[in-house]
Amino acid sequence: MSSQHSTDDLMNSHVFSGGFSTLDDKGFQDVPIHTDMPGSISVEPSSEDANVGSVNGNINETPVFEADRLIAEATMNPSAASSTTGENSISQTGSGPFLRIRIVDIEAENSKDPVIKMNVQTTLPAYRSKLYKNVRRTHAEFKKFAKYLISTHPECLIPAVPEAKTSVSSGIKEDLIYLKSGLQSWLNYVSTNPNLLYDPELQLFVESDYGYSPLINTGNPTSGLKRKALKQFPLPPDPCQALANLRPIVKSFYKNAKDAEIKLEKLVNRKQSLALTHADLGQSLIDYSVEEQHNGLANALNRVGKMLQAISDVRIMQSSKQLVTLADSLCYASDNAFVVKEILSNRHILMRDLISSKNQTNSYLSAANRLQDSPKISKARTDDALQALEVARVHEKLLSDKVDFVTLNLVKESKTYTKKTSVSLQKAIREYVEKEAYYERRLLSIMESIRPHIRNIDPFGGLSRLGREEYPRRLSNPPPSQKTNQDAWTNRKRPGYSSSFDGSSQSTFNPSNNDGAHNTSENADELVEPPIGNERLDPKSVANLLNAI
């Protein structure tokens, strides 16, 4: 019988119930929270973290319900959350309350402050309706809401709101695509974060008819004179090493990203000035070709002028793409890093307030002990001192719970922030390199288009015979220059470098080669050059190689 009872007790224990007590048992609500700051903050959440206070100053005495805890775990765990499908959709896990916000259109009549139209679907009980269509908010209202969230939620790394226009222009289709993608990503974060989901300002942001403005105007505690004064003091001791190392890294990243953006903009401005100079030079050559008496040279000058104008157009488009792909990405990354730095500074202010509260509690405790030991002090005065001590202890406990809660959430969100920043910058750099390669190929194609006109200035090969004693044959159909065995601008084969590129000799022509080369008997464009072996080149041959076009 004793073994049967022990077996029943084991089956009814929390070992087989997942390690958590049920909601009716309320066992997890009785876990005490230590008022002293721990020596180290655990990165992984535990069941003791359920009974934490609110982060908005007013501490809720009731614990976090089990349903809210499950929603928070499902949202903060990337492996449990479903991946987003498409650009504007948000996948929700489970059957709990959710909030989905999807941008349907952007009205860019006012380029400085476009209007964003959204459809909202929710099952949260506090909302008046389950579906809101064509909710209109301006870009300035988005920034007001983001400023409120940054000030009142120090436990969340709120992303920065993307700018209303790119560095190139405003109101065009490409700008709207970038803005829609950035705002949708920002709304996805706000609507899926469990710490922001039940904020009353989020409900007001959705349900306001026109002209949204936050009801609580809270200024940034790390701005103005207080921020400058706090910079003069050393940072408070930080028990969380991850966040202690994160802030200097984010600050350095913010400065370097902003500096790289400024330098890239200067480079683009100079490239655009160079492109305009190319266009002016091309027009001058076109005007000069009209006065030229030699037909071949006049045609070549005209073609070179048009080529320079085409190069100018491509350079301007290339510089615009550089601003959109890389400069705007660096600008948003620096803005986002600045917001993260501000939020980490808000945490330092909370830690300073906690240290001040502990010192005040110790002073009240010393005063109460002195009053109790003195027989001449009235009982009313002693009661007042004890009451003040109790208030100080409650305030210290609330601040301690708030700092622990903020630290735990910031450790989680810092990992997500670093990962998203790395992925976004990798994507921007990849797109930047692809666009650069595309435009450089276009420039090479434009330059190669005038090769026949340069070589056909006269019947003897034009400029292609510079530096040679003998006249080369007329070039009519030169091969493209995208080869490793020759340079089509000079049509010279390079047997001396053949071993470094491939195993075959490039001085011997192979008619079965499929790289686009032509047979010498079919195309008389090959220049007759003396073979160059492995022996030392004489200065005259080197000069011919360097001066050839």
Curated annotation (Swiss-Prot):
Residues 498-507 have a biased composition (Low complexity). Residues 508-522 have a biased composition (Polar residues). One of its GO terms (biological process) is intracellular protein transport. One of its GO terms (molecular function) is phosphatidylinositol-3-phosphate binding. One of its GO terms (cellular component) is retromer, tubulation complex. Belongs to the VPS17 family. SUPFAM superfamilies: PX domain. It comes from Schizosaccharomyces pombe (strain 972 / ATCC 24843) (Fission yeast). It holds the Pfam family PX. Residues 470-540 are annotated as: Disordered. This is Vacuolar protein sorting-associated protein 17.
